[in-house]
């Protein structure tokens, strides 16, 4: 059996390793080397590093859909499966039609919920209690293909996007192995997605990160968790941008304008919101490292009554 793998970031690495260990991988497609770090030296993707460690041929098309010679090489491989995990490029129909059993994508949500670029972040931001991975047969749409298998994961009250990322990353490989075996044994019936249940998970940006203090404390807490470790929730203190890394919700209302700092002690900075109170536990000012409030107030003052914007 021939498997071609397409993926790029850390999230795709456990999936690639699982496929190598279980079936072997014929070739790997990943994004071109990019400048990294302060020196801007060209750096390989995490997937490329693993492929080279296992002596697997690596292809790095700038845009696969615009490279007919590379597509021809892919056809000549005659793959049974193309497995796609966070590749970062849209595959044209010509590529989708190549493998015997189709192109299978691992998507980090329980489809049809949270189609798009940032599903695990939006699952937390929107207050979901359960998410997971879905394997699906790819078609020309954006995460619209028939679903194959799902693996559910609980989102706990204080779980961050970074923590959820690592859980889904590690569990993705096992789900892909089960999916491939299930297809080969005719044990999986592809399931159409219900279009009425869809919602989208657009790419994250710094505009999304700005805290609206008129929202409830729970909604803001979800935003903080969903944007940790990147791009991190933001607010303004005296026109200085402050990153908010960690929070908790406290029941009760202060009857103060949303965003007003109510109290400060070593357990956190209490801020009024549209509903209940948000307690900031870890923050970061420009040109400084992130600190727990207990550390921060040792050398800095926070003015009670000040309104965060």
Curated annotation (Swiss-Prot):
Purpose of the protein: Attaches a formyl group to the free amino group of methionyl-tRNA(fMet). The formyl group appears to play a dual role in the initiator identity of N-formylmethionyl-tRNA by promoting its recognition by IF2 and preventing the misappropriation of this tRNA by the elongation apparatus.
Organism: Clostridium perfringens (strain 13 / Type A)
Catalytic activity, as annotated: L-methionyl-tRNA(fMet) + (6R)-10-formyltetrahydrofolate = N-formyl-L-methionyl-tRNA(fMet) + (6S)-5,6,7,8-tetrahydrofolate + H(+)
Protein name: Methionyl-tRNA formyltransferase
Keyword Protein biosynthesis: yes
Keyword entries, A-Z: Protein biosynthesis, Transferase
Record GO terms (molecular function): methionyl-tRNA formyltransferase activity
Xref: Gene3D superfamilies: Formyl transferase, C-terminal domain, Formyl transferase, N-terminal domain
Superkingdom to which the source organism belongs: Bacteria
NCBIfam families attached to this UniProt entry: fmt
Pfam families for this protein: Formyl_trans_C, Formyl_trans_N
Disulfide bonds: none
Residues noted as binding (6S)-5,6,7,8-tetrahydrofolate in the record, renumbered to the chain: 109-112
Residues in coiled coil: none
Record GO cellular component, one term: cytosol
InterPro entries: Fmt (IPR005794), Formyl_trans_C (IPR005793), Formyl_trans_C_sf (IPR037022), Formyl_transf_N (IPR002376), Formyl_transf_N_sf (IPR036477), Formyl_transferase-like_C_sf (IPR011034), GART_AS (IPR001555), Met-tRNA-FMT_C (IPR044135)
EC number, as in UniProt: 2.1.2.9
UniProt enzyme class: transferase
Family: Belongs to the Fmt family.
Gene name of this polypeptide: fmt
PANTHER family: METHIONYL-TRNA FORMYLTRANSFERASE, METHIONYL-TRNA FORMYLTRANSFERASE, MITOCHONDRIAL
